[in-house]
C-alpha cells in the first residue's frame, strides 16, 4: 500500500500516481484500463499505447489459464510479449465468470501463482461477486468467504506483483464499509469495488453512488480504488468525485460490435445518427452513413476507436477538472445527460460531509450552475465554519446589501452560503459566481446558514435584510430574527 501517491484532491477526486514495480512504470490516475480479450483483439494493445496513450490494461488470467491455444504460449512468452504491450498489465481472476456461470475450477492460490508466472503486474484473487439486492444472509456469508480468500492471498508469494483486494457486500452500505476496512487490513495493494456492473447496466447510479461512498468510508485514503466494470465515459466524473481512481471495461469493443456509439452524455445507435458530434479522427474522416455502409469488421474497428477516443478524452477532462478545482461543475454538467445520472449526482451530494474531508479549502472559483450546487461540500464547510467565527456586539445585521452603523456589527449574506464576516468577502468560496436569477435552493441553503449562526449565539439580536427571499427560505429563519426586504419602503 506504499505504491500510490495522491498529488491533488477535488471533492474526493484524486490526481495520483500508481507505481507498478514489476512493470517498471508509474501510472497517472484517474485512468481507464481497457479490457483486452486475449482471443479477440478489436484494437491491438500496441495501438492502445501508441494511439490512445494507454499506460495500463486488463485481461483475464482465467481465460488464459483454461485456454488450450494460449496457456502454453503465455507461459513461454510471458503476458507482455503475448499481448505486445510494454505498459502495466492487470489480470482478473475469473470472478466475472463465477458471477456469470456460477462456478470456476481454480483456487485463489492457483490463479495468483499463475498470474505471477505469466508476468502479470497486478494480480487478483478469486473473490465472490455478490450481486445487488440479495438477502443479507447470503451477502454476509459470501463476504466472509471473500475475506478469507483475501487473507490467504496476502500469504501467497507474488514477488513484485501487486495484488488487489476486491470489496464486496452487495447493496448493504454497512457490509460494504466493513468489507473495505477488512480489505485494507490485509495489506494488499489495489481495491476493486466488485459486483457493481448490474447497477450500471440498470442505470442505478444513485445506488452506485451509495455503494462507492460506503466503500470509501471503509477504505479511507490508503490506496487506489478500482471501480470494476465501469467503462462508460458518462459516469467517470461522478465516480472520480466519489474517490475512484481506476476504471475498466470492454464497453469500447462490445458497444462497437453492436453499432453503438459512445458519448459523454450516453450511447447512440449508429443508424440513428446523421452527424457525428465528435472531433476524433474517426468522426472527422467519416460520416455516419459511410461507416454504416462498411463491412462489419471495418465498422466495428472504427467504432471501437471512436469509443476509445471519447473514453480517454473524458479521462483527460476529469484530470484537468481535478487540477483546476472544478470537478463538481463537471459532474453537474454530465448529470444533465440522463435522468438516472442526475439521481446519481444527487445521491453523491447526500455524502457531501464525506466529500468535504478531502476537498481543498481554497480554489480558483465556485460556479453556481444548478439547484444541486446548493448542496456542495463548500456550502457545508462554510456553514460548519460559523461555529469558529466570533460575533461582536448585541445587535448584528445580516444583509445582502450595505453595512449599517446602526448595528454593532454587519455581516454579509450570500446565497447559497449564508452569512459571513465582511473581511472574508474576497476569500473562497465567497467569491462565487452566481446567477442574477438565484433559485429557491440557494436561498434556502442561505437561510439554513442564518439559522445555524443564530442558534450558535442565542444572546445576540439579529436582523436579516434579504433580497426578496421566497417564503420557503424565510420559514427556515428562526422566529426571533427581525426580517426586512432589501427593497421594501420603510
Swiss-Prot record:
Give GO terms for biological process.
tRNA wobble guanine modification
Q: Report the protein name in the record.
A: tRNA-guanine(15) transglycosylase
Q: Which family does it belong to?
A: Belongs to the archaeosine tRNA-ribosyltransferase family.
Primary gene name: tgtA
PANTHER family referenced in this protein's UniProt entry, alphabetically: QUEUINE TRNA-RIBOSYLTRANSFERASE
Q: What does this protein do?
A: Exchanges the guanine residue with 7-cyano-7-deazaguanine (preQ0) at position 15 in the dihydrouridine loop (D-loop) of archaeal tRNAs.
Q: Give the source lineage, highest ranks first.
A: Archaea, Methanobacteriati, Methanobacteriota, Stenosarchaea group, Halobacteria
Q: Matching HAMAP family, A to Z?
A: TgtA_arch
Positions binding Zn(2+) in this chain are: 278, 280, 283
Its cellular-component GO annotations read:
cytoplasm
Q: Which cofactor does it need?
A: Zn(2+)
Detail which positions bind substrate. 127, 195
Amino acid at each position: 500500500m506504499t505504491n500510490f501517491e495522491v498529488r491533488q484532491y477535488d471533492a474526493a477526486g484524486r490526481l495520483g500516481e500508481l507505481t507498478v514495480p514489476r512493470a517498471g512504470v508509474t501510472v497517472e490516475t484517474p485512468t481507464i484500463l481497457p479490457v483486452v480479450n486475449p482471443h479477440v483483439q478489436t484494437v491491438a494493445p500496441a495501438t492502445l499505447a501508441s494511439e490512445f496513450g494507454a499506460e495500463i490494461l486488463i485481461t483475464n488470467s482465467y481465460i488464459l489459464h483454461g485456454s488450450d491455444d494460449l496457456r502454453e504460449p503465455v507461459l513461454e512468452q510471458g503476458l507482455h510479449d503475448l499481448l505486445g504491450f510494454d505498459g502495466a498489465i492487470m489480470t482478473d481472476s475469473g470472478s466475472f465468470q463465477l458471477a456469470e456461470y456460477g462456478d470456476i475450477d481454480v483456487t485463489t492460490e492457483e490463479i495468483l501463482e499463475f498470474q505471477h508466472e505469466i508476468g502479470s503486474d497486478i494480480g487478483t484473487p478469486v473473490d465472490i461477486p455478490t450481486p445487488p439486492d440479495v438477502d443479507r444472509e447470503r451477502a454476509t456469508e459470501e463476504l466472509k468467504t471473500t475475506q478469507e480468500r483475501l487473507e490467504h492471498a496476502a500469504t501467497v508469494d507474488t514477488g513484485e506483483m501487486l495484488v488487489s483486494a476486491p470489496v464486496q457486500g452487495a447493496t448493504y452500505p454497512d457490509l460494504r464499509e466493513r468489507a473495505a476496512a477488512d480489505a485494507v487490513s490485509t495489506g494488499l495493494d489495489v481495491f476493486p469495488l466488485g459486483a457493481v456492473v448490474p447497477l450500471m447496466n440498470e442505470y442505478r447510479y444513485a445506488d452506485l453512488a451509495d455503494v462507492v461512498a460506503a466503500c470509501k468510508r471503509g477504505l479511507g485514503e490508503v490506496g487506489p480504488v478500482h471501480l470494476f466494470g465501469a467503462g462508460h465515459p458518462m459516469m467517470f466524473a461522478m465516480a472520480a468525485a466519489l474517490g475512484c481512481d481506476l476504471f475498466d471495461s470492454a464497453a469500447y469493443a462490445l458497444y462497437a460490435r453492436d453499432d453503438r456509439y459512445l458519448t459523454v452524455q450516453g450511447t447512440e445507435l449508429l443508424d440513428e445518427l446523421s452527424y457525428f458530434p465528435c472531433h476524433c479522427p474517426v468522426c472527422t474522416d467519416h460520416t455516419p452513413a459511410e461507416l454504416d455502409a462498411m463491412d462489419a469488421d471495418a465498422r466495428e474497428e472504427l467504432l471501437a476507436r471512436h469509443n476509445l477516443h471519447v473514453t480517454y478524452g473524458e479521462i483527460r477532462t476529469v484530470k484537468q477538472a481535478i487540477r483546476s478545482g472544478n470537478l463538481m461543475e463537471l459532474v453537474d454538467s454530465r448529470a444533465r445527460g440522463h435522468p438516472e445520472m442526475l439521481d446519481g449526482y444527487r445521491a453523491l451530494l447526500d455524502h457531501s460531509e464525506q466529500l468535504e474531508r478531502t476537498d481543498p479549502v481554497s480554489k480558483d472559483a465556485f460556479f453556481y450552475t444548478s439547484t444541486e450546487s446548493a448542496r456542495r461540500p463548500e456550502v457545508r464547510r462554510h456553514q460548519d465554519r460559523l461555529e469558529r467565527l466570533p460575533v461582536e456586539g448585541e445587535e448584528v445585521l445580516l444583509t445582502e446589501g450595505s453595512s449599517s452603523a446602526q448595528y454593532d456589527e454587519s455581516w454579509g449574506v450570500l446565497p447559497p452560503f449564508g452569512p459571513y464576516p465582511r473581511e472574508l468577502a474576497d476569500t473562497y468560496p465567497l467569491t462565487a459566481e452566481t446567477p442574477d436569477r438565484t433559485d429557491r435552493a440557494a436561498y434556502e441553503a442561505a437561510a439554513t446558514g442564518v439559522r445555524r449562526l443564530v442558534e450558535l449565539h442565542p444572546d445576540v439580536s439579529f436582523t436579516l435584510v434579504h433580497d426578496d427571499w421566497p417564503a420557503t427560505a424565510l420559514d427556515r429563519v428562526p422566529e426571533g430574527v427581525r426580517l426586512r426586504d432589501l427593497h421594501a419602503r420603510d
